[in-house]
Amino acid sequence: MATNPLSILFVASEVEGLIKSGGLADVAKALPEALVNLQHDARIAIPAYTAIPNVCDDEVILDTHLETWPHTHYQVKKRFLGDNPVYLIACGHYFDRPSMYAENNQAYTDNGERFAFFSAACLDMLPKIGFQPDIVHANDWHTGLVPFLLKHRYGQDPFFAQTKSILSIHNAVFKGVFHYDEMQCLPEFHCRNVPDAAVSSTHMTMLKAGVMNADKINAVSPTYAEELKTELGSHGMAWEFQQRAGDLVGILNGCDYSAWHPDTDSYLPINYKATKQSMVRGKNGCKRALQEQVGLPVKDVAMFGMVCRLTHQKGVHYLLPVLTEFLKLDVQLVLVGTGDPLLAAQLRDVAAQFGEKFVFVEAYNNQLAHLVEAASDFFLMPSEFEPCGLNQIYSMAYGSLPIVRGVGGLKDSVCDYDVNPETATGFVFYEPTAQALLITMQRALLLYAQNLTELRRVQLYAMERDFCWNKAAEQYVELYRSALK
């Protein structure tokens, strides 16, 4: 019985291959794909944003309405993403807009209502299309109401008698807090009388609604699961996560090696494998190509890379105070990112002063992001917090040793050289200071300068680490089965 295939509906606000703004989209594609590889029936549900290419041409499999909702009419469209069926919930009132969440850096004022509708429609459609999942897997605040609705409304329907809910926490900073007046669209939001509803006297917090009602909860790394039980790590929801501690686990995200592997990466001028000769030739060629592309002197020098959003979370505020001192060393640094205008202005000032050593590319470019990973000897991720992180995993695959702060998924995936050289895959610091980052960068540079043979050994060892999605998917299956017991 334990080996019976499971049926799963993976509910998310975005999915790579259709529409994407962040890492959630990568998980929404890769995890269902891996579940199908393990012989489970995994289907995806997302809103039918008009920004999705050719969404108007998708097959309509359901034309219906949602009772008690002001804008009741919706359609379910269907397409495939690889072997995964995708259900697209179409409602022009909510999703016929230029982008997913915001315009001109202003969030849509009805985002709470939009994603409440989407959550309700995902459950409402299931009996109508005849798909009876064992598990409904919600993700972040956008679908936090799915476990709430399943428990308090749809749970009374015999169709859902055996269906359990999972909530994945990708980033608890974003909670989906909306005024109660905005959430009157369905009777079930009159939930002041529901003891575990995430409602204050004036507001509903959609992520709390999910946390308090999901059958099981997972964070996207084991360390992040522990951090969520603290005020600092949960950003104000420690009590809720402590209450659900027995149902909270951490599962490290996998890596999509079909998109991120130096042997097959079409963005690279030279592909390379995890052998010393191939790696050295490939990384040297990629370093030269990066130097030429961004206008740095072409020379054999320790290359540091960083690709990130310019935000407090990504730790740019740790780099800036020591950047000038660091650039006095024999190094080059390429930083690619957009975001906070104040951080960007400071980076531009340093780049103007150290043009022979530091280039700041204020734009995201996928080709350049891949090339930086391959060309770098070391990759900077000094994050304030990092639920999982993927660039450190990409870096290891490309033989670029990550320099990380020991938080969240960074702590779970990177082994520090000074702690155990034999199993090291990078460099780790813990103290949240610029000086701690500088010392760690200097440690890395010392290895490059004094023992290049040892550096190559560590790089090869890092390249051989395996963070494939099938491993993570097996852990999710265990979580699903525990919810069904």
Curated annotation (Swiss-Prot):
CDD domains per the UniProt record, alphabetical: GT5_Glycogen_synthase_DULL1-like (cd03791)
Broad class of enzyme this protein falls into: transferase
Pathway: Glycan biosynthesis; glycogen biosynthesis
Catalytic activity: [(1->4)-alpha-D-glucosyl](n) + ADP-alpha-D-glucose = [(1->4)-alpha-D-glucosyl](n+1) + ADP + H(+)
Pfam families on file: Glyco_transf_5 (PF08323), Glycos_transf_1 (PF00534)
Gene Ontology BP terms: glycogen biosynthetic process
Catalytic activity, EC: 2.4.1.21
Keywords: Glycogen biosynthesis, Glycosyltransferase, Transferase
Domain of life of the source: Bacteria
Positions that bind ADP-alpha-D-glucose: K20
Signal sequence, start to end: none
A cellular-component GO term for this protein: cytosol
Entry-linked InterPro entries: Glyco_trans_1 (IPR001296), GS/SS (IPR011835), Starch_synth_cat_dom (IPR013534)
Entry GO MF terms: alpha-1,4-glucan glucosyltransferase (ADP-glucose donor) activity; alpha-1,4-glucan glucosyltransferase (UDP-glucose donor) activity
Protein role: Synthesizes alpha-1,4-glucan chains using ADP-glucose.
Family designation: Belongs to the glycosyltransferase 1 family. Bacterial/plant glycogen synthase subfamily.
UniProt name for this protein: Glycogen synthase
Gene: glgA
